[in-house]
Swiss-Prot record:
Signal peptide stretch: none
UniProt-listed HAMAP family: CinA_B (MF_00226_B)
Top-level lineage group: Bacteria
Protein name in UniProt: CinA-like protein
SMART domains linked to this entry: MoCF_biosynth
The species this protein was found in: Sulfurihydrogenibium sp. (strain YO3AOP1)
Protein family membership: Belongs to the CinA family.
InterPro entries: CinA, CinA-like_C, CinA_C, Competence-induced_CinA, MoaB/Mog-like_dom_sf, MoaB/Mog_dom
Gene3D superfamilies membership: CinA-like, MoaB/Mog-like domain
Length: 400
């Protein structure tokens, strides 16, 4: 069985927002033995959506559409599906009554636009929305043995409705077992050496490390491979499935009742920004200093001016004094620092682009690590932030 996923939203086409629904739908379909032929990102335009739906129906058995079911003028999914399959839109009376009850109880007028969220193509089955107002639907095209599934774009609404759609389509049974291992601190060649005897693996490389994707069609074989990967990679695995490094570090900081502070130069606050992205981070993040210029390093972090003159701002002594300075200033349990050359300029004969020194201290011992990572400016900064967060993780798992 083949599927094509259509994500409706001009915000994705214009690069203002990153889609995650397509990945969620694709992963779950893959696990159930459905081969996804592609993910199409469409603007909100009725014309474009219509053409993409026709394109998908020509090539796939299942067409999943996420987004475009709201009450505004740019929500065109219902009409586009209706036109693509040649049936009119009708009100689902059950859902319309629920909308009327909801808006009446909230003293909100039930306008024609709001009523439109109860419209579905004739002959469709509704997928009730447990969270929001827009109803989803499945339209089975018996004559060509295909189906169109329309879901909202809000992930908290889409995900439970997607699982309900799978039940309604009778494709809920898992036929493939999958697992994502997120890995950091090991080189690509070393990883390949450790896992080169294993099939059914795929890799994705980024400044945040390596994602190792395992899949298998039998549970016994899957479990065997899963154990091998864990045994061979050990603490290089920082997360399983889609957790980010900052989420893992945040959990460890909470569990170990530790606080952290940062002193950043090259990363420009990215380390502390990632830490505070996690809800509840105020319980363990005390603060951060962006010491981008030498004066801030000297005046706030008490870095020795002579050391900057003798060794340069990008040096081991400076990284060491930065991390110790911020810990003393903010009075945290742990601290990390970075100083480096993110590029694309700033290199010298002895200091190449990408050179960084990353400091870590727990107040008893301070260590400084030298790293060279070359890429775009933002890729370098992202890698260094990941490296610094990983230092916190490794310390906490070895001192728990």
């Amino acid at each position: 069985m083949k599927a094509i996923i259509i994500i409706a939203g001009s915000e994705f086409v214009q690069g203002r927002k990153q889609d995650k629904n397509g990945l969620f739908i694709a992963k779950n379909l893959f696990e159930r033995g459905v081969d996804v032929q592609g993910i199409i990102i469409s603007p909100d335009s009725h014309y474009e959506l219509l053409n993409y739906i026709k394109f998908a129906l020509d090539r796939a058995d299942l067409v999943f559409i996420s987004g475009g079911l709201g009450p505004t003028t740019d929500d065109n999914t219902r009409m586009a599906v209706s036109e693509a399959i040649g049936v009119p839109l009708i009100y689902n009376e059950e859902w319309l009554n629920k909308l009327k009850t909801y808006y009446k109880s909230n003293n909100v007028e039930i306008t024609e636009e709001r009523k439109s969220m109860a419209k579905i193509p004739y002959g469709s089955a509704i997928i009730e929305n447990p969270v929001g107002r827009a109803v989803g639907f499945i339209k089975v095209l018996d004559d060509i043995k295909k189906a169109v599934v329309a879901l909202p774009g809000v992930p908290s609404e889409m995900e439970p409705m997607f699982y309900k759609a799978l039940e309604m389509l009778n494709i809920n049974e898992k036929k493939r077992y999958t697992k994502l291992f997120r890995v950091f601190g090991i080189k690509e060649l070393d990883l390949n050496y450790l896992l080169n005897d294993m099939k059914d693996l795929s890799y994705n490389f980024s400044p945040k490390g390596i994602d190792v994707f395992l899949y298998d069609t039998t549970l016994e074989s899957f479990k065997e491979k899963e154990k091998k990967i864990k045994d061979r990679l050990g603490t290089f695995i920082y997360a399983e499935d889609n957790l980010e490094m900052e989420e893992v570090v945040g959990k460890l900081l909470r569990e170990n009742k530790k606080t952290v502070a940062t002193a950043e130069s090259s990363t420009g606050g990215l380390i502390v920004s990632r830490l505070v992205n996690v809800p509840g981070s105020s319980g363990y993040v005390l603060g951060g200093i962006v010491s981008y210029v030498n004066e801030v390093k000297i005046n706030l972090l008490k870095v020795n001016e002579e050391d900057i003159k003798n060794f340069g701002a990008v040096s081991e002594p400076v990284a060491k004094q930065m991390v110790e300075g911020v810990r003393n200033l903010i009075n945290s349990d742990l601290a990390v620092s970075d100083t480096g050359i993110a590029g694309p300029t700033g290199e010298s004969p002895n200091k190449p682009l990408g050179l960084h020194y990353i400091g870590f201290t727990d107040g008893k011992e301070t260590k400084v690590y030298k790293e060279i990572y070359q890429g775009s400016r933002n890729d370098v900064r992202l890698y260094i932030s990941q490296f610094a967060l990983n230092l916190i993780r490794l310390y906490l798992i070895s001192n728990s």
